[in-house]
From Swiss-Prot:
Belongs to the NodU/CmcH family. It comes from Rhizobium fredii. Pfam families: Carbam_trans_C, Carbam_trans_N. Gene3D superfamilies: 3.30.420.40, Carbamoyltransferase, C-terminal domain. Involved in 6-O-carbamoylation of Nod-factors. This is Nodulation protein U. Its EC number is 2.1.3.-. Keywords: Nodulation, Transferase. NCBIfam families: nodul_NodU (NF041651). One of its GO terms (molecular function) is transferase activity. It comes from the Bacteria.
Length: 581
């Protein structure tokens, strides 16, 4: 079968005064590789973002290997590809450009895109263009910006700094790069510095050598391991001797003047060789540490390097950049709530913003934002976290009883210590369930955490997050500040650790999500009604999905899964035959 291959062209930063660019109204961003997604921005407003893992019980991190998925996502949201003014493909691995092999229907297509990282300090908005995006029976031109640019754009444009027009720093730490610091102001963004020479994939790679996910092979990359290890570190403690081993090997392999370290830094844009170097580091660590369990020590060492580098940079800066006390965090490492919280607590920044999709689940949004930024500068995006796919209308399995059910009745079921699959409105964006595709449960018994982990086939040490009314959070948690996207760590205050044990992690922390009691989302109403019945303003909140797959796309999918007896979906309650109300 013949492969369609189309010419590409390159350009530098577009002329911001070009009339052609100013006429662009509807932009479609596409992320083809893992965490594949399609997003449409129209007149500065996010219309929708369809992450592939959230369609049809697809596998987590689902890529787009057939461009028919783009056509389908557009059609599901009432958009014809011909009505899109500009398509933008997120860049990927490659020093000069990336290359994507996909299908359009049954026809193989090769698309070329921008590289992973900008090629010079002012090159974030340098783009590569092509004309081979085959959607249905039509071929469209497209642009592609560096992958890192999409992280910067999605983080800043969704931030409060963009709304107020204030400059900010943006820290991007992704799988294949060192933590990179950028400065965003007005119509420009520029690279400031790399903080230290450790790639984001190091945290997950450690799982091949230490802890419950240890394996003998270097293959079989699991994108979910990093998050699981974030929970696992609560089982350990810091040991000076173990940290010393890591520090010594860190200098030898990554940061020092050895031939090994210099070669690693020189070849950072080669993803295969950089990953091999990370594996070599952990293999050497495992050999020296033997049976000792160093995961918590590694976590502490990497974070200390981050803070130390930021502090040193701030101290040595003779001419402070505007907005240097505002920080956006993006990249896959932005999902690490321990690091996010510690950065927020350093005192280096007045305000820290992490979007609900800091990892590649936000890259399609970021790709669309890149085009807006190229035209207008770093303007704010009008967006909602509940902009994913709508619920599908499918027939539930035979035997399930369906009846109308009010929010107060849902609260009563929860107060009787029965979990409820809660499906409402459009899917939330990003990897965290935020009340749109959640399993809710009372947090008043420690057994509930074990039960939720069991029905979801999760390890016993995995935490269950609380969703709490915003105005009550400071009573229960420290700091208890508003955190609507579950991306920071909070300590549970002692009087409440016995009241809500199901949401207290092994180290006393909680991955808190707050929501205003005046929110229009139905999950806020549930919390208000539950508080009236019990005096407790929070519930357990964990994602509603098959193990290893995206959120349930319908009530029917939740019933087919069948591991929770009550499924509530936009006003209807579905009960398993054996269940009691």
């Amino acid at each position: 079968m013949k492969t369609a291959c189309f010419p590409v062209f390159r350009n530098r930063l577009p002329d911001l005064d070009r009339d052609l660019d100013r006429d662009t109204k509807r932009v479609c961003g596409i992320k083809l590789t893992h965490d594949g997604a399609i997003a449409v921005v129209e007149d500065g407003r996010l219309v929708f973002c369809t992450e592939q893992e959230k369609r049809n019980n697809n596998s987590r991190y689902q890529e787009i290997n057939n461009l028919d998925a783009v056509v389908a996502a557009l059609a599901e949201n009432g958009v014809n590809a011909r009505d899109v003014d500009q398509f933008v493909i997120d860049g990927w691995d490659g020093e000069a450009e990336s290359r994507f092999k996909v299908l359009s229907g049954e026809t193989p297509v090769i698309l070329r895109g921008a590289p992973y990282v900008e090629r010079h300090a002012e090159g974030l908005l340098d783009w590569i263009g092509g004309s081979g995006l085959t959607l249905g029976d039509r071929v469209f031109s497209y642009r592609s910006y560096p992958h890192v640019t999409s992280h910067v754009a999605s983080a800043y444009c969704t931030s409060p700094f963009a709304k107020s027009g204030d400059p900010a720093l943006c820290l991007v730490w992704d799988g294949c790069i060192f933590p990179q610091l950028y400065h965003v102001e007005g119509k420009r963004a520029s690279f400031v510095k790399s903080l230290f020479p450790v790639t984001g994939q190091a945290y997950a790679a450690a799982g091949h050598y230490f802890g419950p996910y240890k394996q003998t092979s270097r293959g079989g990359w699991d994108l979910g391991v990093a998050g699981k290890l974030m929970a696992f570190v609560a089982l350990g403690s810091v040991h000076v001797r173990i940290v010393a081993v890591f520090q010594k090997l860190y200098q030898e392999h990554f940061a020092g003047d050895t031939a090994l370290a210099c070669a690693f830094r020189a070849n950072i844009n080669n993803s295969e060789s950089s990953l091999a170097a990370v594996h070599d580091f952990f293999a050497a660590s495992a050999l020296q540490l033997g049976q000792r369990r160093p995961k918590t020590c590694l976590h502490r060492l990497i974070f200390s390097s981050n803070v130390s580098s930021l502090t040193k940079w701030r101290t040595l800066q003779h001419h402070p950049l505007p907005g240097a006390r505002n920080l956006c965090i993006a990249g896959g490492c932005g999902l690490n709530i321990k690091w996010n919280s510690a950065l927020r607590q350093t005192g280096l920044f007045d305000s820290v913003w992490v979007p609900p999709f800091p990892n590649d689940s936000g890259s399609a949004i970021g790709a669309a934002c890149c085009e807006i930024v190229a035209q207008q500068g770093f303007v704010p995006l009008d967006w909602s976290v509940y902009s994913g796919p709508s619920l599908q209308d499918r027939q539930v399995p035979a035997g399930w009883h369906a009846s109308p059910c009010s929010i107060s009745e849902v609260a009563a079921i929860l107060a009787s210590n029965k979990p409820v699959v809660f499906l409402s409105g459009r899917t939330e964006l990003g990897p965290r369930a935020l009340g749109g595709r959640s399993i809710l449960a009372a947090a008043t018994s420690p057994e509930m955490k074990d039960h939720l982990n069991e029905i979801k086939f999760r390890e016993h040490f995995r935490p269950v997050a609380p969703i709490c009314l915003e105005d009550r959070a400071p009573d229960i948690f420290s700091p208890g500040t508003p955190d609507p996207y579950m991306l920071f760590d909070h300590q549970t205050k002692m009087p409440w650790q016995d009241k809500v044990p199901a949401v207290v992690h092994l180290d006393g922390s909680a991955r808190l999500q707050t929501i205003s009691r005046n929110s229009q989302h139905k999950v806020a109403e549930v919390l208000v009604e539950y508080e009236k019945l019990t005096g407790i303003p929070l519930l357990c909140n964990t994602s509603a999905n098959y193990h290893g797959r995206g959120f349930f796309p319908s009530a029917a999918a939740a019933c087919e899964w069948g591991r929770v007896e009550h499924v509530w979906c936009d006003g209807m309650l579905y009960r398993k035959p054996s269940a009691t109300a």
